[in-house]
Amino acid sequence: MTFMAKAGQVERKWYVIDAAGKPLGRVAAEAAVLLRGKHKPTITPHVDCGDNVIIINCAEAVLTGKKLEQKKWQRHTGWIGNLKTTKYATLMAQRPTKAMELAVCGMIPNTHIGRAAETRLHCFAGAEHPHASQKPEVFEL
């Protein structure tokens, strides 16, 4: 018989990923798998089975090739003619956690389960984080 998890049966772990010197996309891909719970044998498609993920050293993550100068982040303010464009070099210098969140959230589906998974993502520019009391496990890439 196939096991179908219920919302109350899901046990959530905490994982910490160090992004220092690692490609942004590889860190984001592993974080997305952990957030969705795809690494668990008890995954159920209609239940949020994911874990909590802490990503530290987002400022030290690297972009390969010429992406730092060529890749752009676009957002719209809602006003006519106000499409804001920012290069990733500027984004990584000013808001490295936003760059990591954009990468991870782009790999998670836009559903109610995906939005719930995005709330369990915690990104920090440095090596310190306030979630030591949860006793997170180190996740090696």
Question: What are the residue ranges of the model-derived segments?
Answer:
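C-terminal structural segments of small proteins and small subunits
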Residues: 101, 105-130
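Ribosome large-subunit tunnel/peptidyl-transferase-proximal elements
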Residues: 1-102, 112, 130-141
